[in-house]
């Protein structure tokens, strides 16, 4: 395998890795025409829960939330510091229950039989508009007494934060002990957020982290299979004393935090039960049932949990709960992408600009890999210098493949050339390249981050395609520095590849293209220097080792 074939192989593998899930998604099973009575009840319950809302609006410096007064659901959440993907004049909407998509947070109290004791009761609030007063704003929703229980649901929003505390205040005047559990749920449809593309696709769907099962993704297609078969076979831990669970998408997430970092688990009274399922043809949910300590007659109690609904900012989410940063989708190379992003973040803290930090990171990675790349490029340079002799052998022996191969092997021996010498070092670099790709692609920190001039958002494509065109030019330059393929078909392919890559990179985030451009420029400089050095040695009659 020569360098050209390896480059083509790596390019194709990278494209397949990035685009496969988007280009060839797992088909969703067609819902069965008949539903059981239980399925119909679940569907009716879900649709009723998402009926038109009576809005209560809460505004802080980071979010604008809409709570349905009757159900107490968090029905809409706008992230005021982030722009919409498709319209920079509008803020980004994470939760919503409009015609476009459904994505809401719900919470209920259940009796010992699992029935919602607040069903059909409804809450009320003293006012419809809330805003920050100091560092916090509290929204108290009160329900009429039911089963001898007085229940309030309280939302607390904090300045500068995307954490929302959801608390039930319970006063038991029923004359008997109340055995309850709190059920916290995130419901959404399977629609893809704006910005998903063929080559820039990230996971969308339920996730759960537990000490027993670590981080697990539960795809919509797995839940469809469960719904179709009537079984619950999706792989995730269903009972845990701690952890977190929710939904993630590119750059953003919503998760119920069972145990805040350094705090007590909400599952202290007993293991929490996790349930992730398809609710009906349109909606999916991830929920956790938290058992509460028995509430004696005349006593008061509370059930409190934090909901994080916001950006996947590593420095923030890492301090909220153990391993919450795993929700940042680095694909299958999290172990490599995470330290690379850590280094990028440290550089940004020093430089103050993500674009320049990417450039410095690229230089550092190139320097670390220099021993590997130097060996590879020297091998390629020797192959390039021997190209005229290889071509002469090909012309001399024509179609006699055996004689041609023997002559070429003799030439390699005489010239001290290892035809595979450039392959292993390049193969060892592939994890680095893939890790860097995911570190840059998945990082919300680059969203809306400018570099210079026309690049005002490193997470979006170059609006004028300047970087992709420069990248294509650098790839063309590399083809002239590398040894020409002996196969005419390979030669044509290597000339076409820069054009194909440039078109593909038109749709890549500018931060990714910036990395490739800088990496290519450094590679050209290194290869040019090595080629010149070897040609000079040969001209002086020295043996090139």
From Swiss-Prot:
Q: Signal sequence span per UniProt?
A: none
Q: Which domain of life is it from?
A: Bacteria
Does the record carry Lyase as a key word?
A: no
Membrane topology, from the record: Multi-pass membrane protein
Please cite one Gene Ontology biological process associated with this protein.
Answer: protein transport
One GO term in the molecular function aspect is:
membrane insertase activity
* InterPro entries documented for this protein: Membr_insert_YidC (IPR019998), Membr_insert_YidC_N (IPR028053), YidC/ALB3/OXA1/COX18 (IPR001708), YidC/Oxa/ALB_C (IPR028055), YidC_ALB_C (IPR047196), YidC_periplasmic_sf (IPR038221)
Record-annotated membrane-spanning stretches: 350-370, 424-444, 461-481, 498-518
Assigned keywords, A-Z = Cell inner membrane, Cell membrane, Chaperone, Membrane, Protein transport, Transmembrane, Transmembrane helix, Transport
Q: Please name the Gene3D superfamilies in this protein's record.
A: 2.70.98.90
Q: Which GO terms describe its cellular component?
A: plasma membrane
Cellular compartment(s): Cell inner membrane
Pfam family name, one = 60KD_IMP
Give the protein family: Belongs to the OXA1/ALB3/YidC family. Type 1 subfamily.
What is this protein for, i.e. what is its function? Required for the insertion and/or proper folding and/or complex formation of integral membrane proteins into the membrane. Involved in integration of membrane proteins that insert both dependently and independently of the Sec translocase complex, as well as at least some lipoproteins. Aids folding of multispanning membrane proteins.
What is known about its subunit structure? Answer: Interacts with the Sec translocase complex via SecD. Specifically interacts with transmembrane segments of nascent integral membrane proteins during membrane integration.
* Protein name (record): Membrane protein insertase YidC
What is the organism field in this record?
Neisseria meningitidis serogroup C (strain 053442)
């Amino acid at each position: 395998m020569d360098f050209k074939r390896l480059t083509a192989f790596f390019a194709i593998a990278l494209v397949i890795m990035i685009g496969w899930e988007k280009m060839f998604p797992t088909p969703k099973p067609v819902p069965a025409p008949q539903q059981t009575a239980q399925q119909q009840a679940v569907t009716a319950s879900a649709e009723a829960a998402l009926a038109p809302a009576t809005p209560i609006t809460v505004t802080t410096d980071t979010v604008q939330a809409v709570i349905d007064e009757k159900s107490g659901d968090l029905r809409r959440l706008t992230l005021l510091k982030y722009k919409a993907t498709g319209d920079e004049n509008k803020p980004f909407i994470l939760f919503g229950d409009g015609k476009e998509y459904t994505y809401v947070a719900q919470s209920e109290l259940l009796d010992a039989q699992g029935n919602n004791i607040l069903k059909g009761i409804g809450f009320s609030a003293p006012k419809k508009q809330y805003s920050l007063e100091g560092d916090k704003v509290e929204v108290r929703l009160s329900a009429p007494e039911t089963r001898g229980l007085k229940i309030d649901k309280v939302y607390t929003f904090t300045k500068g934060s995307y954490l929302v505390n959801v608390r039930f205040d319970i006063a038991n005047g029923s004359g008997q002990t109340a055995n309850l559990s709190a059920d916290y749920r995130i419901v959404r449809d399977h629609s893809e957020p704006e910005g998903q593309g063929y080559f820039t696709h990230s996971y969308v769907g339920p996730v759960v982290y537990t000490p027993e099962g670590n981080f697990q993704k539960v795809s919509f297609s797995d839940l469809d299979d469960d719904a179709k078969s009537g079984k619950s076979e999706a792989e995730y831990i269903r009972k845990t004393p701690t952890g977190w669970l929710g939904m993630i998408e590119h750059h953003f997430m919503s998760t119920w935090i069972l145990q805040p970092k350094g705090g007590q688990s909400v599952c202290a009274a007993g293991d929490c039960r996790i349930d992730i399922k398809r609710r009906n043809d349109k909606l999916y949910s991830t929920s956790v049932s938290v058992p509460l300590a028995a509430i004696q007659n005349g006593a008061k109690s509370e059930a409190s949990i934090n909901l994080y609904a916001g950006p996947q900012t590593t420095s923030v989410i890492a301090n909220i709960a153990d391993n919450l940063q795993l929700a940042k989708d680095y694909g299958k190379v999290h172990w490599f992408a995470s330290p690379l992003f850590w280094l990028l973040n440290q550089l940004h803290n020093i430089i103050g600009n993500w674009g320049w930090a990417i450039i410095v990171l690229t230089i550092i990675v190139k320097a670390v890999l220099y021993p590997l790349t130097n060996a590879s490029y020297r091998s390629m340079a020797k192959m390039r210098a021997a190209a005229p002799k290889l071509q002469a052998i090909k012309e001399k022996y024509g179609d006699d493949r055996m004689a041609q191969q023997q002559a070429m092997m003799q030439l390699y021996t005489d010239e001290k050339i290892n035809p595979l010498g450039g392959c292993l070092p390049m193969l060892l670099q592939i994890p680095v390249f893939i890790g860097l790709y995911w570190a840059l692609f998945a990082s919300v920190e680059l969203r809306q981050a400018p570099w210079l001039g026309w690049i005002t958002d490193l997470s979006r494509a170059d609006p004028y395609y300047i970087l992709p065109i420069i990248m294509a030019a650098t790839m063309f330059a590399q083809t002239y520095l590398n040894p020409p393929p002996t196969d005419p078909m390979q030669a044509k392919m290597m000339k076409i590849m820069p054009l194909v890559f440039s078109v593909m990179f038109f749709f890549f985030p500018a931060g990714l293209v910036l990395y490739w451009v800088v990496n290519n420029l450094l590679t050209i400089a290194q290869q040019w220097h090595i080629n010149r050095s070897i040609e000079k040695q040969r001209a002086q009659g020295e043996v090139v080792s």
